[in-house]
């Protein structure tokens, strides 16, 4: 893929993540976070190109969200680490079905911890409960919804986003 197409694809993924997060903002921010846009983190299984777009999309959404600079910093870092872990999982685990399930759990663990601690600090919420609530939202979106979504689009991914 040439440089222009890579930039456009990265921008499109960032815009899709940010827009999806902000359209359902009441569900996207808070101790229960059901960010439907988090389904997109599993696209990193297909190409590292998505790492930048997803991280940028999270940064944009958090800039416009209610949790301030802490979310811009820590939310973006959490997404970046999660997407990197998703990308590297099939490099370590060769069975594609197992790799998909394990990859889907990284955002649950990483965001649960980082965002849970951040929200607990910002809003004086109980730490363990807040970590659990954030992790639960991630698990529902990324594993329960995301895994079937990825299994559905997997045969079509080259047609949906050509030249990967």
Description of each model-found segment:
Residues 1-45, 49:
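Hydrophobic transmembrane alpha-helices
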Residues 17, 54-62:
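Small-polar-interrupted transmembrane alpha-helices in polytopic inner-membrane proteins
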Residues 26-31, 39, 60-74, 78-164:
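Membrane-embedded alpha-helical hairpins and interfacial helices in multi-pass inner-membrane proteins
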Residues 44-54, 94-99:
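Membrane-helix interface "capping/anchor" motifs
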């Amino acid at each position: 893929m040439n440089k222009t197409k890579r930039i456009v694809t990265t921008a499109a993924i960032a815009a899709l993540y940010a827009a999806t997060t902000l359209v359902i903002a009441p569900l996207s921010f808070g101790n229960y976070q059901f960010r439907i846009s988090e389904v997109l983190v599993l696209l990193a299984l297909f190409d590292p190109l998505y790492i930048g777009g997803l991280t940028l999309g999270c940064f944009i959404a958090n800039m416009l969200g209610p949790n301030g600079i802490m979310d811009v910093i820590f939310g973006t870092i959490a997404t970046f680490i999660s997407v990197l872990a998703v990308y590297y999982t099939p490099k370590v685990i060769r069975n594609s079905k197992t790799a998909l399930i394990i990859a889907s759990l990284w955002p649950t663990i990483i965001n649960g911890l980082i965002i849970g601690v951040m929200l607990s600090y910002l809003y004086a919420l109980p730490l363990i409960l807040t970590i659990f609530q954030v992790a639960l939202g991630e698990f529902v979106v990324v594993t329960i919804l995301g895994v079937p979504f990825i299994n559905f689009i997997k045969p079509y991914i080259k047609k949906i986003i050509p030249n990967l």
